[in-house]
From Swiss-Prot:
Its EC number is 3.5.1.18. GO terms for molecular function: acetylornithine deacetylase activity; metal ion binding; succinyl-diaminopimelate desuccinylase activity. Pfam families: M20_dimer (PF07687), Peptidase_M20 (PF01546). This is Succinyl-diaminopimelate desuccinylase. Gene3D superfamilies: 1.10.150.900, 3.30.70.360, Zn peptidases. It comes from the Bacteria. It comes from Campylobacter jejuni subsp. jejuni serotype O:6 (strain 81116 / NCTC 11828). Belongs to the peptidase M20A family. DapE subfamily. Its cofactor is Zn(2+); Co(2+). Homodimer. It catalyses: N-succinyl-(2S,6S)-2,6-diaminopimelate + H2O = (2S,6S)-2,6-diaminopimelate + succinate. The gene is dapE. Zn(2+) 2 binds at residues 96, 127, 340. SUPFAM superfamilies: Bacterial exopeptidase dimerisation domain (SSF55031), Zn-dependent exopeptidases (SSF53187).
Length: 365
């Protein structure tokens, strides 16, 4: 089947995270000339497809996920019965990211590759906890001395036009929970209470929206963003016993968890508080002079006639795991204007260009 037909079939699988619904077996059968390894951990199914081309040279990998977020109600069609209409395919996962997966599967068919090995790393655990997916496959590859040198993750990266954005890194994510302790009491006798809201009020303006670093050419500033704040029992005559606050920092490599801790400790000096911090993902950056960045840039410009912005914007992705294992990685895919949305759709023209970009990258790597 051709690339579009394969994409339509792939979109029919109800692969709501972490269930692949048979999609990985379907992919393995499509690429029967690749050696297939099904790697399972904690009930999560992953697939490594790999093919040796030469005894020497570099190992290039493509990464992606077949799991999708729940579809919800209000669609113009059954979200797992793809609808082709006016140049688009409507289905859950059309942009995020079955189009990317279908594109690199099409690209590796009957391709000429001067390197040593091509691999495809696929998981059904990205949209959920993402603990036993790509990371587990890379750990398995490390144990077998099979780690790739370079990788492309086919996440939907483009914003307004196909070809306008390549991700060369991602910010990390630090989650914070702050508990300010007080002493509950009658609102008419504030002198007998310790009101944590009043105590924390002067500190709030020092925390909310604070930039922990000035940013750089590649990264925006590491900003503290408050996501939740609550205290009291929802009544007007009792002061709160404590105040609970949650925040997130999307951090660049210039700001660490320890930097966040030091700043919060400094501004909360004198308060009775508890602080809990957790790094849910780490920041990474692939240098713009690296081969994978240069070659991807060349292929994107050649096929799309756009000059892509090399950036680190957006949330986290599985690319961070490649970076953690020392693999030089970039991300490129179709536009992301409908990801996780009702009536998610992908432009057929964008998808066809993505197939060509990946094939050109492989043949000229």
């Amino acid at each position: 089947m051709n690339a579009k037909e394969f994409l339509i079939e792939l979109l029919k699988f109800k692969s709501v995270t972490p269930n692949d619904d048979g999609a990985l077996n379907f992919i393995a059968m499509e690429l029967s000339d690749f050696e297939a390894f099904f790697i399972e951990k904690e009930g999560i199914k992953n697939l490594l497809l790999t093919k040796k081309f030469n005894d020497e040279g570099e190992h290039l990998a493509f990464g992606g996920h077949v799991d999708v977020v729940p579809a919800g109600e209000g669609w113009k069609n059954d979200p797992f019965e793809p609808l082709e209409e006016e140049g688009f395919i409507y289905a859950r996962g059309a942009q995020d990211m079955k189009s990317g997966v279908a594109a690199f599967i099409d690209a590796v068919k009957d391709v000429s590759f001067k390197g040593r090995r091509l691999s495809l790393i696929l998981t059904s655990d990205e949209e959920g906890e993402a603990k036993y997916g790509t990371k587990a496959v890379l750990e398995w590859m490390k144990e077998k001395n099979m780690l790739p040198d370079y990788a492309v993750v086919a996440e939907p990266t483009c914003v307004k036009k196909m070809g306008d954005s390549i991700k060369i890194g991602r910010r990390g994510s630090i989650n914070g929970k702050l508990l300010i302790r007080g002493k509950q009491g009658h609102v008419a006798y504030p002198e007998k209470c310790i009101n944590p809201v009043h105590d924390f009020a002067p500190v709030l303006k020092l925390l909310a929206g604070f930039d922990l670093d000035p940013g750089s050419a590649e990264f925006s500033p590491s900003k503290i963003v408050i996501t939740d704040i609550r205290g009291g029992m929802g009544v007007c005559n009792v002061t709160p016993n404590d105040l609970k606050l949650m925040f997130n920092v999307r951090n660049s490599p210039d700001t660490s968890l320890e930097d966040v801790k030091s700043y919060v400790e400094k501004i909360c000096h004198g308060l009775n508080y508890e602080l809990e911090l957790k790094q849910s993902s780490e920041a990474f950056l692939t240098n713009i002079d690296n081969k994978i960045v240069q070659k991807m840039n060349e292929s994107v410009q050649k096929i799309t006639h756009e000059v892509p912005e090399l950036n680190t914007k957006g949330g986290t992705s599985d690319a961070r795991y490649f970076a953690k294992y020392g693999v030089k990685v970039v991300e490129f895919g179709v536009c992301n204007d409908r990801i996780h949305a009702i009536d998610e759709r992908v432009s057929i023209e964008e998808f066809e260009k993505l197939c060509l970009v990946f094939k050109d990258l492989i043949e000229n790597f």
